[in-house]
Each structure stands twice: as structure tokens, then as C-alpha cells.
Amino acid sequence: CIIHAAPYSHGSGLYMLPHVERGACQVIPASGGFDPDEVFALLRSWKGATFFFAPTMVTRLINAPGLAAADTTNLKTIVYGGAPMYAEDCLKALDLLGPKLVQIYGQGESPMTITALSRAVHTDVGHPRYHARLASVGPAQKGVEVRIADEDDNDLPLGEIGEILVRGDVVMKGYWQNEAATAESLRGGW
């Protein structure tokens, strides 16, 4: 099941689609929002529970006083995204909750499908770049190309700051009845 402690208008709403496809239950907390103690209470009743959390929600969960007494065995996965996750918080969550984390990155024009940091990457502590990988958004998904460009649309070298450009079937085809905005946003298929 998926427990919606995050807004439907963001990742939780989009991430519910694969759960609906599989006939999984959808649980809406009575508070209508995120409360760590309510999450712990819901975990007692729902096996195989998945959540979509912003990184701040993960941080609040792992720092909640109630976590020490909470039974999190029913927690299957926390998918997180929507903002950067501090590597220290990620490590603490892995230590306290076990291998339950998956990170996803998307944009409004290419929702939740650009890059991902898998459960396996989160737990591959022997990798020489383990900590750097935890601080990243992961590799591009299959069928998605990603590049970083400057203001003149030139590719930038690794490590430089620029605009994230995406190409692939997951990218929108255009803005509804707004060709000018489409032409401005989708340049050369990017």
C-alpha cells in the first residue's frame, strides 16, 4: 500500500499510479498531512507500506522522539525527492530504518522519471564514491538523456553548474495550446 503523508499535487499523487495499477490500497492519514507519530501508528496497521517523502520529511521522521519505540517492520520503501537530501541524513535513515530508501528526480515537464538512486546504490557501501553517490540524484533512467548546458545551450563539463536539459519519451510534447512557450522550452528536442 501507499500511505499519502505528502501532497497529492506532488510526488505522492504521481507515485500512486503504479500502486493503483497493481490494486494496492491508498491510505490517507487522518491528519491530512505529515506527522511522524501518525506515520508510526499507521505502520502498525499496514504491511508493505510505501511513502513518498520530501527529504525534510525523512529528516523529521528519523529525528522524531517516537522512532526509538516505533515498529517499522511494515515499512517497505520510502521514495524521496523534490529537494536535495543531505548525505548525513540519508546515512542516518539507512542506519535507523534499514535499506528502505529510493530517490527519484523529475521536473514538471518530465515528472519523476529523469534519474533515480536505487535501493542497491543506497546500500553499496563498498563503492569508492559511495558518499558522493548518496549526494547525487543518480543516473539517468533508461530512455532518458540528460545534459547540463550554459545560457548559450553549450554543454558544460562535469561538475559545472548550469541548466538541466532532458530528452526522451518521458518529456512532455508541449504546452497545451501554447506553441510559443513550447518552442521556448523545447529546443532541439531538449
Which residues are covered by each model-predicted region?
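Gly/Ser/Thr-rich phosphate-binding loop
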Residues: E21-A24, G48-F53, I62-A132, E145, ...
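Alpha-helix capping/helix-boundary segments
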Residues: M57-V58, M85, V171
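AMP-binding (ANL) adenylation modules
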Residues: A6-H10, W46, G106, N154-D155, ...
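Conserved ATP-binding/catalytic segment of the ANL
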Residues: P139, N154-G159, E163-W190
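Active-site phosphate/pyrophosphate- and oxyanion-stabilizing loops and adjacent acidic/basic residues
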Residues: L91, A135, A180
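Short coil-to-beta-strand transition motifs
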Residues: S136-G143
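Conserved AMP-binding/adenylation subdomain of ANL enzymes
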Residues: C1, S9-A49, A64
